[in-house]
Swiss-Prot record:
This is Zinc finger protein 20. Transmembrane segments: none annotated. It is found in: Nucleus. Keywords: DNA-binding, Metal-binding, Nucleus, Repeat, Transcription, Transcription regulation, Zinc, Zinc-finger. It comes from Homo sapiens (Human). SMART domains: KRAB, ZnF_C2H2.
Amino acid sequence: MMFQDSVAFEDVAVSFTQEEWALLDPSQKNLYRDVMQETFKNLTSVGKTWKVQNIEDEYKNPRRNLSLMREKLCESKESHHCGESFNQIADDMLNRKTLPGITPCESSVCGEVGTGHSSLNTHIRADTGHKSSEYQEYGENPYRNKECKKAFSYLDSFQSHDKACTKEKPYDGKECTETFISHSCIQRHRVMHSGDGPYKCKFCGKAFYFLNLCLIHERIHTGVKPYKCKQCGKAFTRSTTLPVHERTHTGVNADECKECGNAFSFPSEIRRHKRSHTGEKPYECKQCGKVFISFSSIQYHKMTHTGEKPYECKQCGKAFRCGSHLQKHGRTHTGEKPYECRQCGKAFRCTSDLQRHEKTHTEDKPYGCKQCGKGFRCASQLQIHERTHSGEKPHECKECGKVFKYFSSLRIHERTHTGEKPHECKQCGKAFRYFSSLHIHERTHTGDKPYECKVCGKAFTCSSSIRYHERTHTGEKPYECKHCGKAFISNYIRYHERTHTGEKPYQCKQCGKAFIRASSCREHERTHTINR
């Protein structure tokens, strides 16, 4: 039985020349695999069946793959003469239907039709077993490059390779510095900049060139995670993310940076990392002119202009600019720490925290400050440190105008305005602005006091307390008041200086009385509840 208004295979297939394929990042190749797997599933669901393909192997020769898949689709139908049409999938015909006015070519063997002689001839050879003179001379690859002697099955593959061989990349992106060897490559790439792809996400409006990529993306919003790790049970939205995660268990890394020795799972990751050494930032924001190392970074940055935060926590309603931040935030509710240090067993919420921690064991600090020579474990730490020399504070609070060196400091400060306390004690329900405060508070329940004074043996719940205490033995008072010269052991000087400035930032919500310290305000507020 034939399906009415069924799509042609080319409408759902994704194709690249072998040379375009060679230029793709592993992450882009992984996307291809995802798309083809989804295509197989979708076509199977409408009655088309064939043997399960090993896409991992077959995507190495995608163009020949599509011919095989067409044949398998034909074989799966009841009649051998299925009426399936064959379009030659040229570079700029990807994901498009056959253009009107093109004369079809009919196979004399089985009666099937195709729009191009190349696709028809390929099909006839499949029917008759006929091999052309070029085929007999060079085997399956009749087109041979004079420079490198590499041979190709298809003319367009040969032509694309010829450009790659001569380093010719005539197509460049106006939005960024990327260059491409074919018109189709730049068209697909421009969708990322323009956001005008034909398939849009129902939830956030993000545009995609292919339907299947859009469907995979929507899983971020729906929470569907069909791919599960057998070792730890963690689930993922995409099949390609799973093997990357599995490397956290095996410790396998594919590439190592020659500059600093850091290891990476994919060549695309190491290419991006190398820019931290060279200083190359090919992606520029049109609104503010700021430049970035990676495309994902500029996409994330653009949301600071639009204020867009499409990823919302179902538990507390907090919104985020990217899915990974929501995922990381979710672990503050669950307490999950899936990434464990092999040397000391300490667990972390995300891989970046683990990687940062692991460097404390090696003491490797490849990034040196040019002004003072201080070494750092990663480029981002060096960048933040350099602000101590320049005095730069790029992160400003929209509520009060206060500026900060670090974005994380701004985020924490904003909680003083919103009153948000996302970290709650499971034992008594008390909530805290900072996770570190919760961690210290939990020791009041457990009785754990890991910091002991070497002079008198007194123990403390947090490191700052023991630092202040030790100064009672040494007599050190590093904090001096600018107004009266009085010195202090701790940063209590902040409260003291308010006695000179008259600043009282903590106000009672009931009567409006203001206080220098938050603890004084809280104590006062209790007088209202007692008087009731």
